[in-house]
Regions:
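Domain-level signal for Mg2+-assisted phosphodiester chemistry and nucleotide/NA-binding surfaces
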Residues: 2-128, 173, 178, 182
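Nuclease catalytic cores that cleave nucleic-acid phosphodiester bonds
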Residues: 94-221
Length: 221
């Protein structure tokens, strides 16, 4: 299936019925759909990824007024060698952000934080990475509420449920897209239209063109 097939046969939805469309992509959530798209290859690490440029191509089929992408980046560690894992992750995350901007997304980004994690007895058990954009996405949706008729949300995070309910009370339509096994029941029930993303895997696969392209991340996130 290519984009023309998608437009002709699997149409996401008819944009004429949804007025002015704003798209909000929670890319940290969307990126993990790769584990559902290609479970064998991504059992432990991300060996297959979602292509941000192809993602933009699919989104553009519904002729959005604006499209936003939210994604955190690792900090550069100038005191460490360039081939250190942290610097590799930094370059990979910046590469994705640059690609999103070149693909027409308005990008919201910030540093990924590492937080000490302790067990119930107060024993240090490691560090966890944290970088969610719930507040930023909510603020963008609320501040721009008069500029759109429909929110097209790319996420399965149940944390958006209350926000989307509020938007519906303001006569906004909600379209949510997510892999079936990543989608929360709350988002399914409050959406005017829920679209399973699973049939899009072939359209969204990232295929490096040459060796100069940053390698696929071996993160076990």
């Amino acid at each position: 299936m290519d984009l023309l097939d998608l437009k002709r046969d699997y149409r996401l939805f008819d944009p004429k019925e949804y007025g002015r469309i704003f798209v909000f992509v929670d890319f940290s959530n969307v990126r993990h759909w790769a584990k559902s798209f290609w479970p064998k290859e991504n059992k432990k690490y991300f060996k297959k990824e979602i292509d941000i440029n192809k993602l933009a191509g699919v989104i553009n089929l519904v002729r959005p007024v604006e499209k936003f992408l939210y994604y955190g980046h690792y900090k550069e560690c100038p005191d460490l060698p360039s081939d250190n894992l942290f610097n590799i992750k930094f370059r990979q995350s910046i590469y994705r952000i640059d690609k999103a901007r070149k693909s027409g997304f308005r990008v919201r980004t910030k540093d990924i934080k590492e937080i000490d994690n302790f067990d119930d007895e107060g024993k240090f058990v490691g560090r966890i990475r944290k970088c969610n954009f719930d507040i930023e996405m909510a603020m963008d949706m609320l501040l721009k509420i008069d500029k759109y008729d429909t929110v097209f949300l790319w996420s399965g995070d149940s944390d958006f449920h209350y926000l989307l309910q509020y938007l519906k009370s303001k006569k906004k339509k909600i379209v949510t897209i997510c892999c079936r096994n990543f989608a929360s029941d709350e988002l399914r029930t409050c959406s005017d239209l829920f679209i399973p993303a699973d049939p899009l895997s072939d359209l969204l696969e990232y295929i490096p063109l040459d060796k100069s392209t940053p390698s696929v991340s071996r993160e076990a996130e």
